[in-house]
Amino acid sequence: MKLILIKPVKKLGKIMDIVDVANGFGRNYLLPRNYAIRATNANLEIVKSTVQQLNEKNQKGIDAAQAVMQKIDRSFITFICQTSDDGKLFGSITAKEIIKKLQISSDIKAYIDIKPIKTAGIHEVEVSLHAEVHCKIFINVARSNTEAQEYLKKFNAALQNTNNNVLVEKN
């Protein structure tokens, strides 16, 4: 299926790119979410005339995502969960729970591509706020607040040993 992208899509293309994708991906993902339109001659003419507006809209999205990134980049989010003695969680922490705890405004749709976190400790997670804007956050999973502080101290000590900047909890 040939489509014209009207929003940038990670690992697929930018605005105005004509892409050939699987029928299911186009019908079930790109078209319903308004990331693309069918590549017909009429649609190509329409997109060429509105490319300026699309680029401005894309730039506004990038600016909003960068503003959010400034707030959350390299921040810590602490989850207090029940764990077994060997540090395995009873359950897991999913991307949906992380996004909910980030409390990002509804204008920005954050995307986190991770497997559920099932162990205690500090985990690094990449957050995509826009196709072109990404940041890293740290998930601190512990049984109690004191254990979370211990993990943070160990993490900061490890960073000092590698000559990186010391991170402090932003929550």
From Swiss-Prot:
Classification via SUPFAM superfamilies: L9 N-domain-like (SSF55658), Ribosomal protein L9 C-domain (SSF55653)
Alphabetized Pfam families for the sequence: Ribosomal_L9_C, Ribosomal_L9_N
One example of a Gene Ontology biological process annotation: translation
UniProt keyword list: Ribonucleoprotein, Ribosomal protein, RNA-binding, rRNA-binding
GO CC annotation: ribonucleoprotein complex; ribosome
Protein's UniProt keywords contain Ribosomal protein: yes
Keyword Ribonucleoprotein on entry: yes
InterPro entries: Ribosomal_bL9, Ribosomal_bL9/RNase_H1_N, Ribosomal_bL9_bac/chp, Ribosomal_bL9_C, Ribosomal_bL9_C_sf, Ribosomal_bL9_N, Ribosomal_bL9_N_sf
Molecular function GO labels: rRNA binding; structural constituent of ribosome
Summary of the function given for this chain in its UniProt record: Binds to the 23S rRNA.
Family stated for the protein in its record: Belongs to the bacterial ribosomal protein bL9 family.
Protein name: Large ribosomal subunit protein bL9
Organism annotation: Orientia tsutsugamushi (strain Ikeda) (Rickettsia tsutsugamushi)
Organism lineage: Bacteria, Pseudomonadati, Pseudomonadota, Alphaproteobacteria, Rickettsiales
